[in-house]
From Swiss-Prot:
One of its GO terms (molecular function) is zinc ion binding. It catalyses: Hydrolysis of DNA containing ring-opened 7-methylguanine residues, releasing 2,6-diamino-4-hydroxy-5-(N-methyl)formamidopyrimidine; 2'-deoxyribonucleotide-(2'-deoxyribose 5'-phosphate)-2'-deoxyribonucleotide-DNA = a 3'-end 2'-deoxyribonucleotide-(2,3-dehydro-2,3-deoxyribose 5'-phosphate)-DNA + a 5'-end 5'-phospho-2'-deoxyribonucleoside-DNA + H(+). InterPro entries: DNA_glyclase/AP_lyase_DNA-bd (IPR015886), Formamido-pyr_DNA_Glyclase (IPR020629), FPG_cat (IPR012319), MutM-like_N-ter (IPR035937), Ribosomal_uS13-like_H2TH (IPR010979), Znf_DNA_glyclase/AP_lyase (IPR000214), Znf_FPG/IleRS (IPR010663). The lineage of its organism: Bacteria, Pseudomonadati, Pseudomonadota, Alphaproteobacteria, Hyphomicrobiales. Belongs to the FPG family. This is Formamidopyrimidine-DNA glycosylase. Disulfide bonds: none annotated.
């Protein structure tokens, strides 16, 4: 499932084409994805200019002129691509570095089997199509008003973003104080950190030398202040997310960028999906193990993560 860095990468790839463009019409090729599309979705968004693209946790938001906002979730296998309706000056850009999000767009191609939504745009570079493809159909789209966005059923109750200054050790100490819950489960709670998923929790715990099985409350002292280990964990979370965004996310099964290229952070994994391989901590002679926590795979080194 695409996590925060993947969705951020998609947002950055779509924004140069979509922001400021006129959404001429939305074409729905089926009545639903994971959930039914909002009633009159096509009519509600047609003829509206796109003001801005943003991201909240693992959700992409597309703000339209007039205050309506499209909320999109990629589910397990969803992806966007940008295609232009014909050759023309400035419509197709190629970069020496195709991994840069948004620097490469494709000419129009034949429709693919799982192209379920097509946004037809009048963009600054000419007519374009932004196509949502989702083989498993676990993604979904919803509509909300800008002023009520934070309280939308999909967004309300989300915790702090791991990319902002609000996520610090004091914040996590307040959330973890007195908790016997395993550290990994506490970090995956979207009410604590919005958008943080399985891959990047494993990587952050390895970077900070902490066991995923350790009780979250052990990182907080008796006065509910963060111990140094929690400070290090907070720094590791922010760093691993920043590194993953810079690498364009991780391409494991289904994630591709809006330009059709792959993310590269999976080549930097230190523990995730490395069961049985040597730990990459300097001087550590341990090997990466896989355990299951709450039905999900956890990868860690029991030798150096305590």
């Amino acid at each position: 499932m695409p996590e925060l860095p993947e969705v951020e990468t998609v947002k950055r790839g779509l924004a140069p084409t979509m922001e400021g463009a006129l959404l001429v019409r939305a074409e729905l090729r089926r009545p639903d994805l994971r959930f039914p599309f909002p009633e009159n979705f096509e009519d509600a968004v047609a003829g509206r200019r796109i003001v801005a693209l943003s991201r909240r946790a693992k959700y992409l938001t597309i703000e339209l002129e007039g205050g309506d906002v499209i909320i999109a979730h990629l589910g397990m296998s969803g992806s966007f691509r940008i295609e232009f309706d014909g050759p023309g000056e400035g419509r197709i850009k190629e970069s020496a570095d195709p991994a840069v999000p948004g620097d490469f767009h494709r000419p129009r191609s034949k429709d693919e089997k799982h192209d379920h939504v097509v946004f037809h745009l009048d963009a600054s570079c000419g007519p374009a199509r932004v196509i949502y493809n989702d083989p498993r159909r676990f993604g979904f789209m919803a509509l909300a008003r800008r002023e009520a966005l934070a309280e939308h059923v999909f967004l309300r109750g989300l915790g702090e973003e791991p990319t902002g200054n609000a996520l610090d050790a004091a914040y996590l100490a307040a959330r973890f104080s007195g908790k016997a819950q395993p550290l990994k489960a506490a970090l995956l709670d979207q009410r604590t950190i919005a958008g943080l998923g399985n891959i990047y929790v494993c990587e952050a715990l390895w970077r900070s030398g902490l066991s995923p099985k350790r009780a979250a409350g052990t990182l907080v002292d008796k006065r509910a202040r963060p111990k140094q280990a929690l400070v290090q964990l907070t720094d590791a979370i922010r760093a691993v997310i920043a590194d993953a965004i810079a690498a364009g996310g991780s391409s494991l099964k289904d994630h591709i960028q809006a330009d059709g290229s792959l993310g590269y952070f999976q080549h930097s994994f230190s523990v995730y999906d490395r069961e049985g391989e040597a730990c990459r901590t300097s001087g550590c002679r341990g090997t990466v193990e896989r355990i299951v926590q709450a039905g999900r795979s956890t990868f860690y080194c029991p030798h150096c993560q305590k």
